[in-house]
Amino acid sequence: MARIAGVNIPTGKRVPIALTYIHGIGSKFADEIVSAVGIEPTRRVNELSDAEVLQIREYIDANLTVEGDLRRETQMNIKRLMDLGSYRGLRHRRGLPVRGQRTHTNARTRKGPAKPIAGKKK
């Protein structure tokens, strides 16, 4: 099992699909990595030599922000918005939708389960 960017890559899958298991690499970047390194996209991970895995690892380290660094960067961006006191930061702080979605109905994923309101019982 190959280990790239701290993630165990599944061995039975094709290389571009296996690379998408790394946080921060989608299908577009996976195809870009495979073509840049010069590996056939139809090859499986268990068919790669150690040198080819090393090439992939070096390309990712040099050109992409992935896994923990990407998560940390995202968290720092959200924290910066909250510290600035911007509208988006306030929405993050309150746990509400950030991008202008309606909240009168819906937004249950962001707001959490519905809280019952005490009313008269029939």
Curated annotation (Swiss-Prot):
GO terms for biological process: translation. Gene3D superfamilies: 1.10.8.50, 30s ribosomal protein s13, domain 2. One of its GO terms (cellular component) is small ribosomal subunit. GO terms for molecular function: rRNA binding; structural constituent of ribosome; tRNA binding. InterPro entries: Rbsml_uS13_C (IPR027437), Ribosomal_uS13 (IPR001892), Ribosomal_uS13-like_H2TH (IPR010979), Ribosomal_uS13_bac-type (IPR019980), Ribosomal_uS13_CS (IPR018269). Keywords: Ribonucleoprotein, Ribosomal protein, RNA-binding, rRNA-binding, tRNA-binding. Pfam families: Ribosomal_S13 (PF00416). It comes from the Bacteria. Transmembrane segments: none annotated. Belongs to the universal ribosomal protein uS13 family. Part of the 30S ribosomal subunit. Forms a loose heterodimer with protein S19. Forms two bridges to the 50S subunit in the 70S ribosome. Located at the top of the head of the 30S subunit, it contacts several helices of the 16S rRNA. In the 70S ribosome it contacts the 23S rRNA (bridge B1a) and protein L5 of the 50S subunit (bridge B1b), connecting the 2 subunits; these bridges are implicated in subunit movement. Contacts the tRNAs in the A and P-sites. This is Small ribosomal subunit protein uS13. It comes from Paracoccus denitrificans (strain Pd 1222). The gene is rpsM.
